[in-house]
Each structure stands twice: as C-alpha cells, then as structure tokens.
Curated annotation (Swiss-Prot):
Molecular-function annotations in GO: SNAP receptor activity; SNARE binding
Subcellular localization(s) per the UniProt record: Membrane; Cytoplasmic vesicle, Secretory vesicle, Synaptic vesicle membrane; Cytoplasmic vesicle, Clathrin-coated vesicle membrane; Golgi apparatus membrane
Chain ranges on the Vesicular side, renumbered to this chain: 221-224
GO BP: autophagy; endocytic recycling; endoplasmic reticulum to Golgi vesicle-mediated transport; Golgi to vacuole transport; intra-Golgi vesicle-mediated transport; intracellular protein transport; macroautophagy; retrograde transport, endosome to Golgi
Protein name (database record): Vesicle transport through interaction with t-SNAREs homolog 1A
A Gene Ontology term for the protein's cellular component: cytosol
Length: 224
C-alpha cells in the first residue's frame, strides 16, 4: 500500500513542478501562447487534484497507528495544491486584464480607472477566497486528527479489554492451581499418616512376635 502512495507522491511532485514552471512563464508569453498555456495548466491542475484524491484514499486504508506520518504529508501536499491554485488564479486575472486592455485599446482614463478598481476588487476577493481555503484546510486537518484520535482510543480500549480478560484467566488458573495444590497436600498428608500407622502396627506386631518366641523358648526350657 505504501508503495502505491509513494508512486502517487512522485507523480504529484513532478506534476506540481511543471505547473509551477508554467505559471511563472504565463506573464512573459505572447497572447496566443498564453491562452494555450492557461488551458494546459488547468488540465494539469485537474490531474494534480485527482492524484491528491488517490493519495487520500490510500492514507485512509493505512492502520491508525501508522497513519500520522502520511496524514502530515497529505496536509503539506494540500497546502501546496492550494498555493498553486492561488498563483494560477492571480495569473489568470492578470491574463484576463491584459486581454481586456488589448480589446479596449485607448478607451480613456475612465475605462482604465474602472479596470484598476475591478482588479483591486478581484485581488481582494481572491485574498478572501484564499483565507477561506486555509480555514477549510485547518478544519479538515482538525477533523482528521479527531478521527485518528478516536480510532486510537478505541484500539486502546480494546487492548485494555483483552488484557483484562487475560489477567482474569490467569487468576482463574492460579486459583485452580492453588486448589489442586491443596488437594495434593491433603492426599500426601493422608498417605504419610497411613504410612506411620502401618509402621507402628509393624513394630507392635514385631514386639508381639518376639515376646511370643521368648515365651515359647522359656516354657520349652523349663519343661526339660
């Protein structure tokens, strides 16, 4: 899975480098080439967005405990993408203004002032859009962190539950072992008691036999 992600990363790096180079060349190109270059950059930006989507899908399939590094890289790539789109918008505004100036020609100071005002309004709108995009990216990053934290918490709870079950099973085995040891101890005590009793009986029997033999010998001697 990480190999696919790294492949998308390499494609994204090459593509964004080409886009950056082309955006910087737009202002210096002749009108016909500018139009073609703008269309080409739009196509490549769409390809870059698709690569980001593929990379995002790959990151979502990574286990939560290993996802943090990839999520940070994704946030960096999305910020880079946002900057490219902003630079391209500014380049398009400059290109549109240039085309309009060529069409209008020398329409007078009034038209020029209106164009300047329109350019300022567009720049202001672009700044607001950029701020909204940054806020959206921060919210998305915060949401991803919250989701990852929740998943990690769930895994920790599951691990704790498994550990608790293992500890309980170990305690049960210890109780069973203690019970078995108690039974074994009682059995050994009973066996020792019977052995001692048997030895005492043997000693008593031995004494009785000896006394009987001695008595018989005594009577035998006296009879002769």
């Amino acid at each position: 899975m990480s190999a696919d992600f790294e492949g998308y990363e390499q494609d994204f790096a090459v593509l964004t480098a080409e886009i950056t180079s082309k955006i910087s060349r737009v202002p210096r190109l002749p009108p016909d080439e500018k139009k073609q270059m703008v269309a080409n950059v739009e196509k490549q930006l769409e390809e870059a967005r698709e690569l980001l989507e593929q990379m995002d899908l790959e990151v979502r399939e990574i286990p939560p405990q290993s996802r943090g590094m990839y999520s940070n890289r994704m946030r960096s790539y999305k910020q880079e993408m946002g900057k490219l789109e902003t630079d391209f918008k500014r380049s398009r505004i400059a290109y549109s203004d240039e085309v309009r100036n060529e069409l209008l020609g020398d329409a007078g100071n009034s038209s020029e002032n209106q164009l300047i005002k329109l350019r300022e309004e567009r720049a202001h709108l672009l700044d607001n859009t950029e701020r909204l995009e940054r806020s959206s990216r921060r919210l998305e990053a915060g949401y991803q962190i919250a989701v990852e934290t929740e998943q990690i918490g769930q895994e920790m709870l599951e691990n704790l539950s498994h550990d608790r079950e293992r500890i309980q099973r170990a305690r049960e085995r210890l109780r069973e072992t203690d019970a078995n040891l108690g039974k074994s101890s009682r059995i050994l005590t009973g066996m020792l008691r019977r052995i001692i009793q048997n030895r005492i009986l043997l000693v008593i029997l031995g004494i009785i036999v000896v006394i009987t033999i001695l008595t018989a010998i005594t009577f035998f001697v006296r009879g002769h």
